[in-house]
From Swiss-Prot:
Name of the molecule in the record: Probable endopolygalacturonase I
Subcellular location: Secreted
Keywords annotated in UniProt: Cell wall biogenesis/degradation, Disulfide bond, Glycoprotein, Glycosidase, Hydrolase, Repeat, Secreted, Signal, Zymogen
Record lineage: Eukaryota, Fungi, Dikarya, Ascomycota, Pezizomycotina
Disulfide bonding pattern of the chain: C35-C50, C209-C225, C335-C340, C359-C368
Gene responsible for this protein: pgaI
GO CC annotation terms, alphabetical: extracellular region
Superkingdom of the organism of origin: Eukaryota
Active site residues according to the UniProt entry: D207, H229
Similarity comment: family membership: Belongs to the glycosyl hydrolase 28 family.
Glycan-linked positions: N246
Pro-sequence residue ranges: 19-31
Top EC category: hydrolase
Record field: catalytic activity: (1,4-alpha-D-galacturonosyl)n+m + H2O = (1,4-alpha-D-galacturonosyl)n + (1,4-alpha-D-galacturonosyl)m
Length: 368
């Protein structure tokens, strides 16, 4: 009987010894090796478990997304060579990221080429072909996207919905669209975000260099923007989130664009724009407005009738200098009655163009 007990205990001991340690399995999973993928399907399905992912000359099939929204937290994603996309009329996105502690970058000489001319028809998102949005940086937290070279997006380039996201030294070159029907090629569209920092961007496009529709604690600095619609807040209003606050846009240049500095809010909507600073912005060859602030947008166009539901308060305009084209307006302000207040306005020095005779409800201290 005694020998049976001993044998039983020995057998039990061997089973316990053979059982894997949960902590060791967990740690080994976290330390998975680098992975290189040559197809979008591989990358989208097999990225989990890789601490570093290299995307080597990926050709994304038509109508599919290079989906990197399920990578492990802390993953580094590296673009290598040319990333390209098949043609199909659909809404996209062509690429998407999500996660915590994610780093996205590229190796020297890499390019992410949307080949947007296949979709461009001069209508953008307002009709014609259905065009895919390019990149979703959604549900990213404590992450970095750096050094990407992006070319010829079909429409909007990078859509941001994130918390504490750094976007540094990104080039978005849609200049081919100037003569080939590029439209609505916004570079950075930001919504429902807290802590977005865009530094050193170089943008050539046919729409906003940056458009902040909602969010707080947002910074754009050291940027160079040309060909588009300028540095924009809005349109604000008519969405689930209609609050913009604590935004700094500074130390940047805007050239050969429709507008320089722009804030626009939606007619008869509600929301707020507060504590926004534009400082040290250099303008050159601005075609329509050097500075334009209006509370009258409806269906994508100004109505000429401002409303008061989205007040603009705590605005600082400081050091906006340079030139506008001969037919352009230096400054245009169209506010509702009492809905623009507590503004600081200094160092505005624009040449060329003309002054507006249609400004309304200009707040104390501002000049139109």
């Amino acid at each position: 009987m005694r020998s049976v007990e001993i044998l039983g205990l020995a057998a039990l001991g061997s089973l316990v010894a053979a059982a894997p340690s949960p902590s060791r399995v967990s740690n080994s999973a976290k330390k998975a090796s680098s992975c290189t993928f040559t197809s979008a399907a591989q990358a989208s399905k097999s990225a989990s478990g890789c601490s570093e992912i290299t995307l080597d000359n990926i050709a994304v099939p038509a109508g599919e997304t290079l989906d990197l929204s399920h990578v492990d937290d802390g993953t580094t994603i590296i673009f290598e060579g040319t990333t390209s996309f098949g043609y199909k009329e659909w809404k996209g996105p062509l690429i998407q990221f999500a996660g915590t502690g994610i780093t996205v970058k590229q190796n020297t000489g890499a390019v992410i080429d949307g080949d947007g001319s296949r979709w461009w028809d001069g209508k953008g998102t307002n009709g014609g072909k259905t065009k895919p949005k390019f990149m979703y940086a959604h549900k990213l937290r404590d992450s970095t996207i750096t050094g990407l070279s992006i070319k010829n997006t079909p429409v909007q380039a990078i859509s941001v919905q994130a918390t504490n996201l750094q976007l540094t030294d990104i080039t978005i070159d849609n200049s081919d669209g100037d003569e080939n029907g590029g439209h609505n090629t916004d570079a950075f569209d930001i919504g429902e975000s807290n802590g977005v920092y865009i530094r050193g961007a170089v943008v050539k496009n046919q729409d906003d260099c940056i458009a902040i529709n909602s969010g707080e604690n947002i910074e754009f600095s050291g940027g160079s923007c040309s060909g588009g619609h300028g540095l924009s807040i809005g349109s604000v209003g008519g969405r689930d989130n209609n609050i913009v606050k604590n935004v700094t846009i500074t130390d940047s240049t805007i050239s050969d664009s429709d507008n320089g500095v722009r804030i626009k809010t939606i007619y008869d909507a509600t929301g707020s724009v507060g504590d926004v600073t534009y400082s040290n912005i250099k303008l050159s060859n601005i075609a329509k407005y050097g500075i334009v602030i209006e509370q009258d947008y409806e269906n994508g166009s100004p109505t000429g009738t401002p409303t008061t539901g989205v007040p603009i308060t705590g605005l600082t305009i400081d050091g906006i200098t340079g030139s506008v084209a001969s037919n352009a307006v230096q400054v245009y302000i169209l506010c509702g009655d009492g809905s623009c207040s507590d503004w600081t306005w200094k160092g505005v020095d624009l040449t060329g163009g003309k002054k507006s005779s249609k400004c309304e409800n200009v707040p104390s201290g501002a000049s139109c």
